[in-house]
Structures are given as structure tokens and as C-alpha cells.
Amino acid sequence: MSLRFLLGRSGSGKTAVCLEEIRRQLQEDPKGRAIVYLVPEQMTFQCEYALIHTEGVGGMIRAQVFSFTRLAWRVLQETGGMTRYHIHDVGVQMMIRKIIEQRKQELKLFGRAADKHGFIEQLNEMITECKRYCLTPGELRRHAKAFEDGPDQPGRRLLADKLSDVALVYEELERSLIGHYLDSEDYLRLLAEHIPRSSYLRDADIYIDGFHHFAPQEYMIIEQLLRHCRRVTVCLTIDRPYDDGMPDELHLFYLPAQTYRQLRELALSNDIAIEEPIVLSANRRHEDRALVHLEAQFHRRPLLPYGAKTDAVHLYEASNRRAEIEAVAREIIRLVRDEGARYRDIALIIRQTEAYRDLVKTVFFDFGIPYFMDEKEPMHHHPLIELVRAALETVVTRWRYEAVFRAVKTDLLFPTDGDLHMWREAADKLENYVLAYGIKGDKWTNNERWAYRRYQALDGLNVPQTDEERQFEDMLNEWREALAAPLRRLERRLRRAEDGRGFCMALYLFLEELQIPKKLEKMSAQAEADGRLVEARQHEQAWNAVVDLLDQYVEMLGTESLPLAEFVKIIEAGLDRLEFSLVPPAMDQVIVAQLDRSRLIDIKYAFVIGANDGVIPAKVKEDGLMAEVEREQLRELGVALAPGGREQLFYDPFFVYLALVCPSRRLYVTYPLADGEGKALMPSPLIKQLTELFPHAPVHLCGNDPFDAPAEKAEAFVTAPRATQTYLISQLRAWKRNYGIDPLWWDVYNTFIGHRDWKEQVRHAVSALFYTNGATPLKKQWSQRLYGKKIQASVSRMEQFQKCPYAHFASHGLRLKERNVFRLEAPDVGQLFHAAIKQIADRLREQHLDWRELSRPDCERLSAEAVERIAPLIQQQVLSSSHRYEYMKRKLKHVVARTTHVLSEHARASGFVPIGLELSFGPNGDLPPLRFRLPDGTVMELVGRIDRVDKAESSQGVLLRIIDYKSSAKTLDLTEVYYGLALQMLTYLDIVLTYAEQLVGQPALPAGVLYFHIHNPIVQAKQWVDDEVEMAKKLLEPFRMRGLLLADVEAIRLMDGRTEDGQWSLIVPAQLTKSGSIHSRSSVASPSDFAALRQHVRRLFIDIGGQIADGVVSIAPYKLKDKTACEFCVFKPVCQFDEALSGNEYRKLAPQTKEAVIEKLAEGKEG
């Protein structure tokens, strides 16, 4: 029995010596005693490959490559330690969560933290660390007691509580596992116990390679190997034997020197012979003298510069991380294409994997570079995992919309042999219905049929259901049954389950009934056929992982009774931890490795990525349960734990050294100057060190395209087709802006255009360079097919065209509309207000009452009755769907009651009486439509509904006025009237005046147009108001109507008989002077002004109608001051209007004063 050290700096050939010795022994005696090559887990695949391809080996039985865990399985299979059930990390974490829930009252700190994301994982890591460093729960308790009883210092009490809680959970976990289960750390303990009984390892030759340090559990295993194996050879990356003592903490080889000393002491304490160390001094790896110089001089002070020029060390400075990875990808393509490199000769070494993971995937896909990322990928994005999560969430949240459709959108609820495209379309339609009707809870699970009506709210009163609606309703219920039935069965089984086994059985039956294995197999076959080999394997892994998770739950917690919500929490915690296992799908691929973790063999070209300050060297990160200060306090008590942040800082130069010297031919070190958000990043001190060491090393400046990197030749950007196409388009864009480009790009363009697989894609991309965001006018026949030969239009439609012709086309030509959502929107509130006022007016007419006769209690009673009758007709009874909406309904009653009271006050003060409410005009309306013959002969009819028409008798004849109810403040802006943006009120006035004889039996004069704001304002006063008359004025003032009145004193007094000379009217926007004339600040217009406005509006209608008939659909939104047509437009995703695009500009309208508008109309000038 002996211990032999094989020592040498990186690249000295330690691994090669091991492989050569193994080869020689295999050739001498193929069936001799076992040879075990023990390496880190992440190195096993590469070592097996290297060993099997060692010249003269071929196949082998005697030698095997193991990690510590795989060796444990091999020994326990032989000696009988595998009878206990193996629990993965996922199972352990589920058990920990259960323990915390059960012992929450006894925990001092952890009870409150259990539900925080990542806490269970951190606690598991802490317990794992305790096991690796041979700390028992009892020892943790003793240390907790020591801190509790010791001097009162900051943090000691907190540390005592932490240790106490860890000990409690740790002890309970061990009690649950002992005798029945094994977790990953138990294998190492059992391996140490079972090595003496293993005939396989007795007198074996052990080679330990690739390790720089060991945990106490691993030292226990090595101790047993030393006792029972013929020879243990340990390879360490170190410059010399440290028999004479430890080097300084800042020494480059401090970490492996520490390991060397501990192994030596272990052998001496067991009376194991220590052979003379073999120290390899020659550099056998590096082919270039510059890399030999780097290996020898790294971390030496003072630095010895390498005087000669070199092509073996390159520095890349990139504008951002994407430019950095694209530059690396271009160089990889060049190496493979021009220098004959294989992808497997190349490695990317990254410390910040989270910052680069997605970038590497995206860029390497574009460049067609095969790669293997040495990092396990979480499963949470897989459809099966999402289905399980969403299905359980559906049950516990009472069928919330989000949970149900997360399950639906996995595609796994669809019938196995169904048409995927058809079912996705059906799911979209079902989702639209669920959103519009507010479907949740019992509406999914009861047997009540879902009803469908195309017409919403008050529009659909007394309209029978059409055949089209009935047909869609039938399909809707079929889709509902097909998709919801499996979830309903799952819910019934989960509700009936009495323990963990019942819950898991319900979930398994749910997946089995959906034929998930068959569906995943189909998905896997499709992925494999498309060449997506990694994805193909992931489908099978996902199914096995979910089944294994349920098995582990049943095994450990199957007999436990617990609430369904708690079961779901535990399963979700398990799902969070599921990861895809890593097996390289091909041999020739770039290795993407982590700087601190990966072990690389036979790499010729290495790219050290992201060499920024704070990354290399690394900052101390405290992301575990134990803070660095607490680890120091434990270390003072002699407690050994994993290296803390301070120790890791000492070790960091060693890992950086390993990364820099791993390539045999060329080293590239890259760093970005900004992150993804544009924040500046500083280069690592390593960059300064390398530039001093290699003053003649080339430094490359890398941008996102050829213009950003003028030093690079154009040929460097011609790589894989997908990436080259991107660069080509950027060059052509520059050419279009009159910049010069390299002639090579025209050759690239011609090559693409002549290639059958790429020409259409490139043509499409090039056409985008000349794209102008405009809309081609419709041909006459298409315009007629869309709008009809006789156009029937509302006034708001005419306004919409004036705001933006394309918005009109999208709304009335394409008939696009927003997805209806089950909530109360502003238009619904406005609709309710209108309907309530009309119902109150109808009730008064039925009871032969007048508005003037209403008292405040009458207003409140009538308003409450009206709102109660109308509410069920608004948005699928949304106002009865929740307590929140019930409260809103009460508030709406108050608004209507306040409005009704104000209207009654207006009636008492006014000589005008309503003669029409919701007065319709059109072919079948109360009044005929307003008809126009357009220039091309097309007839256009204006149709609509007027909120309220009032009449008064004056000395000059009958006066008519229009009142429009608005749920938001509104005034009549003559600038908007002039430009055709606000045509409604004057059009309504024109209609009632045009058809006055039909309406009132004689011609009439315009009294004005007014907006009445329906609201419930808070009255503000600077001091307490006791006077009732004054208070009445304060209450009426916020309801003063806005608009435009006839400039006639008699008409104004008819509108407000209470107005006093010199005072503003509380009802209309007018004031009479003390002399009885109209004040200049009043909003009034003469009869001739009204006539000019009416004529102007009519001319606008003819112009707008003519443009509609001619097929005008231009993207031309208006801009008036700070108002634009795009502000509240729902069609922006369709038109994609963008001022940055060529041809996209606002149609800017100049503001006009009231006087200027009147003057222009009088002169006959049009807007």
C-alpha cells in the first residue's frame, strides 16, 4: 500500500502520464487487478473518451473511469449497500419542506423564511455541506449552545439560532432517511464504510486526477483507498512538493499545496508508505513559446515581458456583450474554415454564465456553431412541467383564467390525434370567450351550458339568437368539454384524496389519461427529424423526471395527510429543482465551460470570455445561509466548512491561471465595455497584466457590424449564411445612406440571390430597406365591396376618418376590434348613464310627472331602480360579479341620483323642455337620415342617435337645443369643428333644424349645443357655508354645461331664468352684464355663425364621404397641439406608425381661435 504524488504545473503532462501508465498496464495484463481512474463528475466523459482513444487501448475491462459517486454505486452494488431507496435532491427538498411545516413552531428563524423562493434549496445546500464536512446535528447543537452562552457580541445570537434550526431540520431529515433511504451525500459515507469489503478495490491501482482540493468525506474515502489498494496516485497541479511547510496564502499554488499537505498527513497517520513524488517540470502542452512564457510568468512579480511578436495571445475589446460573442463566433468559424481546427478543439471559458448563456445560444445558432454547454438546464420551461404546474394551480385557485390557459397552451390537453393547428385556433376562440364572459370557478365545473351572443350589453335586447351564434355556441361547449374534462377529473380525485399517495395517484392518472408519453414521444420524433437532438432527448427526460418525482413523494410522504395546497407547494418546489441531464449529443462541438468548475482536456484554442473588473478576480458573494462573518466565527471554534468568500479570493488566481494556460495553441481573452443595458464596464486587471506580459499581442476592437470594427477585414464577417445575411443587410442599409461599402458585399449579395435556399429570405430582407410605411389606396371595386354602394355612416365614423383615414379603414373596412374583456370600461359606464337617464325620463312620462316636480328622495329612488334594471345588461352582468363591482354599482347609483337632481334643478330654472330622448335618425329612425350625393354618384346617409333635444317658445319662434350627456368633461372646440374632428353636436343640430317641421310642426331656430357632464364632484369651499342658497349654487356650479349658445339674451334667459345680471349662469356657459347684454366671455354665436358652421360641416361630410368612396386609407394621423390621433388608438399594432420611418409624419393642424374660425367660414374658406 502506498501513496504516490504526480506533481507538475499545468501542461506538464500529468494526465498523459496517467493514461500512458494505464495503457501500459492494460497491454501487459488486460485481465489484471482493477485500475480506477478517479476524476471529477464533469470530467468523466472526456476522460473516458481520452482513455478509449489512447493508442493501443481499444476496448478494456480492467480500467474504468469513475467519479466519487459513480465509484460508490459500483462498490455498493458489489457489497450490498444499494437496497435502500435513492432519494435525489428534489426528494430531499420535498422532505425538508415537510419537516419545516411540521416543526414550524420550534424553529427560531426558518419558520418565517420557508416560503421564500430559493430558501429550501439553500437549506439543503447547508445540510449537504455539513454532511460533506462530517458535521453531525449534535455538534451543530453544541456549537449553537457555545454561541448562546458566550459573550454578548453582535451576530452571535443570530448564528446560534441559525445553527439550532439547521440542527433540528438536519436531525429530523436523518431520522426520516435512516435505514430506508439514501441521498447523494450518503453514498460517499457508505463508500468509505464499504471499501474494506470490496474485492473489486482490493489491491487495485487508483489514479486520482483533476482535483485541486477535497471535502472531509472525500478524504475519508481516500483514506480507505490508501489502506486497501495497492497504490494510490494523486495528480496535483503544483510547482513542487511542499514537504517543508505551506506557502503564503497569496501564493498561486496555495490551494493544491494545502491539499498536498493534508494527503501527506493522512498517509503518515495511517502508516502508509509515501513514494518519492514524481515532479514533471517540462511543458508538454503548449506549442507556442508565448504560451509557455504565460504559464511560467503568470502571477510572478515583477513581470518579465515577452519581447517577440506573437500570434498565440489575442485580446478582444468589444462595445458590448453581443459584439463580444459575435466576434468570438467569427473567429471560431475562421479557425475551422481556414486553419483546419475542429470544433472540439475549442473552448469558451465563462465565469458569468447567467450573463452569457442566452447570448451564446442565440449567436452560435445564427453562426451554425455546434456547442455543448457544461451546465445543467432547468426543466421549468418544458411543456409537461408547465402542464403539471398549471393543472394544480387551476384546482387550488378555483379555475382562474391564467392557470387554465397556461395548461391549455402547452398543447398537451389537446386530443392525441387531433389537428394541432385546428385545436390551437379553437383554444384561442375559447380564450376570447372566457375573457369576455368572465368565466372562472363553478362556471367551468357545473353542467350549465355556456351561452353565446354576439351582441353585447344593451344593443342585443330582444334580439333572437341567430343560427351563426347557435352554431358557435355548440362548438364552444364542445371545446370546453374536451379541454376542461381532464382537469375536472383531476380536481375530483385530488379533493377525494386522503394522503400523499392519493394526490400523486390523481396526478399520475391525469397525465396517463391525456396520453402524455405518447404525445411526448411524437414531439421527440419530430424534433429528431428536424435535427434538434438535444430537444428530442429532453422530452423523454421530462416524463421520467415527473414520474420519478411522484415516486419519491409517495415513497417518503405517501402516508402523510396534508392539505391540498401544501401538497401543491411541495410538488412545485420539486418541479423547480428538476434539471435535464447533460450528455453531449455530438463529439465535434465547442465546449462552453464555467471558469471555476469545468475540467478541460486537449483544448487547442481557448476563449476566456467577459474579463471585466469584478468578474476576474471575482467579488465575494454571500448567497448562502451562512454569512462570511459567521463562517469566520465557526472557524475560530475549529469547525471546518466549505471555503468562504475570503478563502475563495485567495484561490481565484489559481482558477484563472488554469483557464489561461489550458489551450495548447492560442489564447483569446475578451471583455465588453458595456452590458446589455448600456452601463459601462471596466476591463479586468488581468487585461493590464496580459498587455504588460505581451506588449506586442494584437488587440482587436469588436463592434456589432463591419462599420464598428474597421480594423477587421470584410472577409471576417462572411461566415455562416444566417449571420452573414445580418451583416449584409446592415451594409446595404449603409450603402442606401450613401456610405461606401466593401465591394465584397456585392459578391455576397449575388451569391445569396443565386442560392435556392436563401434567395427569398434575402430578397425579403432587402425589400425591408426600401420599405415605406404607407397604405395603398383601395381600388374602386374593393371600396364598394367593403363599404357598399350606398354608405351608411355615423357621425363618429366621419370624425374617425378625419383623425386618421387608416384607423377608419381598420375599424370599418377590415372591421377589426379589440378583444373584449370582462371588466367595466369607460364606454360601459357611459352607456349605463345614458340608459339610466332615459329610463328615468320614460318612467316620469308613464307617471305623467315632470322633471320640475322631482324631490331629492325621488331622484335617489328612481336612480337606484334604473341602475338595478340596467346593470344585468352591462358586460355580461359584470356589476354583480364581485364585491368590488357591487361597490362600484352603489357609486354609480349616487352619480345618477346626483345627476337626476341637477337635471330637475335645471328644469325648474329653464324654459326649455325635453321633446326627444335617445332620438334616432336614419332609414327607420324617429327622423330621416341626412343624405348626401358624393362626387362619384354614391349616396351617403348619416345615421345615429341624439341624447336629448329641448324646445322653447320665444318671441322669434321655436328654439331647439341639443344636449349630449358625457361621462367625462367635454367642451366644443371650434378648431376641432373646423378640421372635422368634432362634428357630432353641430350635425345633430343640423338634423333637428332640417327636420323641425316633422319634429315640432314648424321651422325652428338654433338655441345652441351643450355637453352635460355626468359625475359626482366634491364641492370645494375655502370656508364653511351656512347659507342654503349659497350651498345650492356651490352644488350646481360643477354641472354648468359647456358648448355654444345662440347670441340672444332671450334665449339665454330661457335656458336659465334664475341668472342675475352681472353673474355667470349656473346652467349654461354665458353671463349677462349689469346692463342686460351678453358678456364677451360667453360662449355664443350668431344665427349666421350657426348657419356657416352647419354649411361647413355638410361640406366636410361630402369631402370625407368622397375620400371613403375613392378608397383613401392613408396612414395620416392628425396632430393638434399636444393631441394626436394615435394617443388612444387601438390600431397602432396594425398600422405601425412611427415618426422614425420614412413617410410617417403627423398631419399637423394649426390651432385656430373661435373668431378666426368664424371669420374663415364667413369668407368661405375651408379647413
UniProtKB/Swiss-Prot annotation:
Gene3D superfamilies: 6.10.140.1030, P-loop containing nucleotide triphosphate hydrolases. The keyword Phosphoprotein does not apply. PROSITE patterns: UVRD_HELICASE_ATP_BIND, UVRD_HELICASE_CTER. Residues 1-359 form the UvrD-like helicase ATP-binding domain. Its cofactor is Mg(2+); [4Fe-4S] cluster. GO terms for molecular function: 4 iron, 4 sulfur cluster binding; 5'-3' exonuclease activity; ATP binding; double-stranded DNA binding; helicase activity; metal ion binding. ATP binds at residues 8-15. Pfam families: ADDB_N, PDDEXK_1, UvrD_C. Coiled coil: none annotated. The keyword Iron applies. [4Fe-4S] cluster binds at residues 804, 1126, 1129, 1135. Disulfide bonds: none annotated. One of its GO terms (biological process) is double-strand break repair via homologous recombination. Keywords: 4Fe-4S, ATP-binding, DNA damage, DNA repair, DNA-binding, Exonuclease, Helicase, Hydrolase, Iron, Iron-sulfur, Metal-binding, Nuclease, Nucleotide-binding. Binds 1 [4Fe-4S] cluster. Its EC number is 3.1.-.-. Residues 282-588 form the UvrD-like helicase C-terminal domain. The heterodimer acts as both an ATP-dependent DNA helicase and an ATP-dependent, dual-direction single-stranded exonuclease. Recognizes the chi site generating a DNA molecule suitable for the initiation of homologous recombination. The AddB subunit has 5' -> 3' nuclease activity but not helicase activity. Despite having conserved helicase domains, this subunit does not have helicase activity. Belongs to the helicase family. AddB/RexB type 1 subfamily. Heterodimer of AddA and AddB. This is ATP-dependent helicase/deoxyribonuclease subunit B.
